[in-house]
Amino acid sequence: MKKGILGKKLGMTQIFNEEGKVVPVTVIEAGPCVVIQKKTSEKEGYDAIQVGFGTIREKLVNKPLKGHFAKGNVELKRFVKEFRLEDTSSYEVGAEIKADIFAAGEKVDVSGVSKGKGFQGTIRRWGAHRGPMSHGSKFHRAVGSMGGSSDPSRTFKSKKMPGHMGHVNTTVLNVEVAKVIPEKNLILIKGGVPGPNKSFVVIKNSVKA
């Protein structure tokens, strides 16, 4: 059964497994999320639920969104996301989705926006080799050849060049849920997940599981 939840990355720590080995984990505050809208194949053409997470001041929400929340009679939420499901009959508008929908040992996909690195050169951005560092060398970290001269008289599209690095939507696939703490709405994911601390993440069933 498909399922998903929204959360906030709190940071990383480590726990011990049954064998006494240290396991690095990412702590995610997962929910509680509120169902804002329910979509059905009869009306919208597909089955899905729209959920919200996190508090937000009223002055930061525009009028159309305020009306959308008012229609479902739910509080204003900072993050809104839609999850497509095979069956939405078990969900009602206003219902809460909590961290206990997942269990330890399950495989999930975690999506977020990766850390921004700013403007970077080809060495850091693409792993290019640097030039000679010895006396007489005219280039060290500069870009090498970028294309032909008179033919083709241009630089090809998609050439790996310096530029903005990071701050892109990123998903890590098939990672394991190490532990769930339902009373605190925490999910511990084995390893790292995209984004800085306090960033918004989406946790869904693994597509590869």
Curated annotation (Swiss-Prot):
GO BP: any one term: translation
GO terms under cellular component: cytosolic large ribosomal subunit
Ranges for region Disordered: 141-164
Keyword Transcription belongs to the record: no
Pfam families: Ribosomal_L3
InterPro entries: Ribosomal_uL3, Ribosomal_uL3_bac/org-type, Ribosomal_uL3_CS, Transl_B-barrel_sf
Gene Ontology terms for molecular function: rRNA binding; structural constituent of ribosome
Keyword set includes rRNA processing: no
Keyword entries, A-Z: Ribonucleoprotein, Ribosomal protein, RNA-binding, rRNA-binding
Protein family per UniProt: Belongs to the universal ribosomal protein uL3 family.
Function: One of the primary rRNA binding proteins, it binds directly near the 3'-end of the 23S rRNA, where it nucleates assembly of the 50S subunit.
Subunit details: Part of the 50S ribosomal subunit. Forms a cluster with proteins L14 and L19.
PANTHER family from the UniProt entry: 50S RIBOSOMAL PROTEIN L3, LARGE RIBOSOMAL SUBUNIT PROTEIN UL3C
Database matches in NCBIfam families: L3_bact (TIGR03625)
Protein name per Swiss-Prot or TrEMBL: Large ribosomal subunit protein uL3
Organism: Clostridium acetobutylicum (strain ATCC 824 / DSM 792 / JCM 1419 / IAM 19013 / LMG 5710 / NBRC 13948 / NRRL B-527 / VKM B-1787 / 2291 / W)
UniProt gene name: rplC
